[in-house]
Amino acid sequence: MRILLLSHSFNSLTQRLHVELRERGHEVSVELDIHADVTRESVALHRPDLVIAPFLKRAIPDDVWRSVRCLVVHPGPPGDRGPAALDWAVLEGVAEWGVTVLQADGEFDAGPIWSFRSFPMRCAAKSSIYRNELTSCAVAAVLEAVAAIEAGQAAPQPMQAGDPRIRVRGPCRQADRTIDWQHDSTMTVLRKINSADGMPGLVDSLFFQEVRLFDAHEAHDISGVPGTVIAQCEGALARATVDGAVWIGHVKRLAPKSLKLPAAKVFAAEAAYLPHRPGCGYAPIRYREHGEVGELAFSFYNGAMATGDCEALLGAYRAALERPTRVLLLTGGPDYWSNGIHLAEIEAAESAADESWRNINAIDDLARAIIETTDRLVVSVIRGNAGAGGVFLSLAADEVWASDQIILNPHYKDMGNLYGSEYWTYLLPRRAGAANATRITQCRLPMGVAEARRLAIVDRVLSGEALADASLVQSGAAMASDAGFAARLAAKQQRRAADEAEKPLQSYRDEELRRMKLNFYGFDPSYHVARYNFIHKVPKSRTPLTIAGHRIRRAPGRPVGMAVSS
């Protein structure tokens, strides 16, 4: 089928659908919901059999859904209606939630239901649930609906007006989730912050200054006078509740153009007087050992790795190499493996160019340490999405194991033609081949694990229980005890020596950084403009041609909607 994805942004769900539908042979193009007239134009250009709207903030124009079937993904179970479905679900602590695929008609969220999925809720940020459970269920539901439409099934009947499942909820506002520090329990505080995490952030005050709170975690073995800030750890601040405390990892001031940054950095002067309490529930980096398997786990907010994060992870990596293990797992968090350098920290720096340079060198140091590890096998375990330098950092390991639910974005160019580093010019061609490496980095499209496996970017695809910590350790132990381990390690050492003799790692780094220096310090400001627009969420004025295939002028005879092959 020829399918148009109509979305407010090319977010994680839209990317997953783009990948999964193309993988199944559909002709997919994307249009960002910029204006009703632009939507009409995109329908005229692409001539879709079906429009799918994974993420909208307004209704599809009447004349569009009347002329072509439009499916809307609603982040709630059948009968739920309103613009803040997931916010309310997280805030109210429901045990189960769902996602519904319905056909657009004259009433918002009230059209015929083609499919739906349910999932158990966990105590987590709204953005994390959206990126994981909701996205996985939405993809399954959309694919079911598409298959039914392809099979010629008639549209289901809409819910009857008196159906008891119908519940219309308005926006979830600040007043609905304001924290009462003198009465709210730790779990209540977490639900309130989690319900606004991602966007818009929960407004509260710290040190008598209003900020938006993000990245909340339950604190362990810490308590104090409710409402007071009592400790710090790895950039987070602990604030006491009536029955414990919560860690606040990131905050954002209310002033225009403020940035979301580590809480202890925003309030550095105040935090200077607070005790450090490591091991109390906030730990972006952890190391555990299981016999011959070491596991270095890391989880940075939104996958962004600041200079200090890279240096801390490198220190932990070097410490892990001192341990007598045969296999080392580098396990990323449930939301992201890594998205590379920390653009918000760079934007906040006195010199964005200088901080960009420090950050890229810090992540390069980490990548090089992994590449040069020859006394054991290293595995990158990707359980959440990865982008840009984060993808190439994972390739520094001997093997890459990835969840079947993730999306990879192995390219940099969307960030103002950024060239990239992390030794990608060595690592990517070594796995995918030179021609594929060029195509991947130029196409700038999201990649699913099926394609990544075909290109040898991913070595093993994992799902379900195989992603649990115990299963990962078991897989690592099997690798460590394999009869061919010694031979494999020797082959690794020989290949590294041969590669170094052919072209030293330093040469790759020098060449990459020469190009990056132009991005950071050169006359072309594209990187700095793109970074600013990304960090401040400046709305796009048009859909990038890399995903809007219907807007590319094509040679005669070439299908209008065919996206660039990846």
UniProtKB/Swiss-Prot annotation:
It holds the Pfam family ECH_1. InterPro entries: ClpP/crotonase-like_dom_sf (IPR029045), Enoyl-CoA_hydra/iso (IPR001753), Formyl_trans_C (IPR005793), Formyl_transf_N (IPR002376), Formyl_transf_N_sf (IPR036477), Formyl_transferase-like_C_sf (IPR011034), HoxX-like (IPR047180), NiFe-hyd_mat_HypX/HoxX (IPR009188). GO terms for molecular function: catalytic activity. One of its GO terms (biological process) is biosynthetic process. PANTHER family: HYDROGENASE MATURATION FACTOR HOXX. Involved in the post-translational processing of the hydrogenase large subunit. This is Hydrogenase maturation factor HoxX.
